[in-house]
Amino acid sequence: QSSNRYFENCGERSLGQFLSVSFLVAYYILPQYFGIRLPGFDLTAQRMLITILCLFLLSKESRKKMFWEGVRSCRLWLFMAGYLGICFYTAVLRFHIGTFLYPFIELLGAFLVIYVLREYLGSDGFLVLFRRMLLFLCVLGLVEAVMRKTPFAYLETIRGLYTGGMIRSGSYRIMGPANHSLAYGLILISGLPLLCIDEEKHCFTLFRHLPLLLLVVVNVFLTGSRSTLAVMGLELLLLTVLAPGEQRKKLLFTIVPAGLLI
């Protein structure tokens, strides 16, 4: 009986890890126009995985308990509750359930990310997965720059959400899985600090994954977004300040002059 319980727990653990990885891949990589159109509601790939993961949580009391502990321990939940309250108030005034439902789904997705990171992947496992996803996006970004069309467009199953290519001053602006070049730029710069984490030394370093960092920088340039470039420059400066002493000096003598030239 104990051996059966052991294999059962191992099976549940493996299933949880598989769903966690699938959820994060869908959440970070797959476009919003990949899914199923239902009357009054688009069931995107992200929402499918959110639904499946929620059913997995609800199927066992211990998993529900761990999820709610993560929600309660989140320091931003008061601000999130206030935001949801405003959305609910707006939904009542507009008589449209989507005004409340869509922000609720986004917040639920954020809490699920916290849950799978704590319970199934851990910080090291999450960072390894994240770097692989970022590498995948950046390589496809280079392919898109050559094709002048995002490869994710071939996943369009919900018609009307894909906006097509973006061209400014004759130059094509890559957009990845997003619907706008600016949105893709935000995806890239939001992951930049995570890319520079050194798990072994527990510090920030720009040299830990330098080839991938350069790919991210090139992709940000190819988005053609000046605001995104400015934010990326600020991020690199802050990461330089947070780097170890000797590395900080080297970076200040290279990144700062390069930034001024750009």
Identify the meaning behind each predicted range.
Residues V128-E156, S169, G176-G224, T228-L242:
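Alpha-helical transmembrane segments of multi-pass inner-membrane proteins
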Residues I29-P39, Y162-P177:
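Juxtamembrane membrane-water interface segments that cap and precede transmembrane helices
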Residues L38-L43, Q247-I262:
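Alpha-helical transmembrane segments and terminal signal-anchor/GPI-anchor hydrophobic tails
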Residues D42-K60, L101-L112, Y184-L192, L229-L237:
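Membrane-embedded alpha-helical segments of multi-pass membrane proteins
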Residues Q1-R63, G85-T90:
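N-terminal signal-anchor transmembrane segment
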